[in-house]
Amino acid sequence: MLIGEAQLRRIIRSELLRESAKSPEDLPKGTKFIFTRYGDNEIDLDVKSPGNPMMGKLKITKSHEGCEGAWEVSFSNALVRGLGPLMYDAMMEFIYPDGMVSDRYSVSDAARRVWKHYHSNRDDVHHQQLDNLKGELTPDYEEDDCEQHSANKDRADGPNMGNWRQSPLSKMYSKPGDATLGKLYSLGMFVRRRG
């Protein structure tokens, strides 16, 4: 079976993302993952080390619309290559059983690759299709209605381009268990605060 050039590019990008993802053991000694909860509507994750006061930041806010009660990424910035997926894994475990969704209006290319990787390559991360605000998929159920602006403008590859339901950004993701948080805790990297 021959694969096309576009499919080969997707495979290579996926492998590069997988190989570049950091694990807690890859980070400098003294690195801290600081989870700060501000009431019931915002959680910040700041990743710092003694030599780098800001390695990465991930901010999530409780969705104002249905979205199955998911937390929405409102800000994400990883200044260390491969740290983004580790921050997302840690945050999804931290908020479980709640799920997490991408920013509903704007998603960087790097973040889109992470969401696509979760959707296509991570059996340990669950994904659930969300509806749009018109209720096209589940007209009699409003809890899954969610803004799909990012999914609508997503530059999805292949024949499904333009179909918001095919975009990894149209889903809610959750990660049961504590594989990542357990490692952070055992390495003395996990810090929980109230804002």
What are these regions (language model features)?
Residues 1-20:
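Protein-protein interaction and targeting regions used for scaffolding, dimerization, and localization
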Residues 3, 82, 106-109:
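Residue-level detector of secondary-structure boundary/capping sites
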Residues 11, 15, 90, 94, ...:
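Charge-rich, solvent-exposed alpha-helical interaction surfaces
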Residues 21-67, 97-195:
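Terminal substrate-recognition subdomain of acyl/acetyltransferases
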Residues 69-81:
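Extended, structured, electrostatic nucleic-acid-contact surfaces
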Residues 72-74, 90-94, 103-108:
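Hydrophobic, well-ordered secondary-structure scaffolds
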Residues 78-94:
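Conserved acetyl-CoA-binding loop-helix of GNAT-fold acetyltransferases
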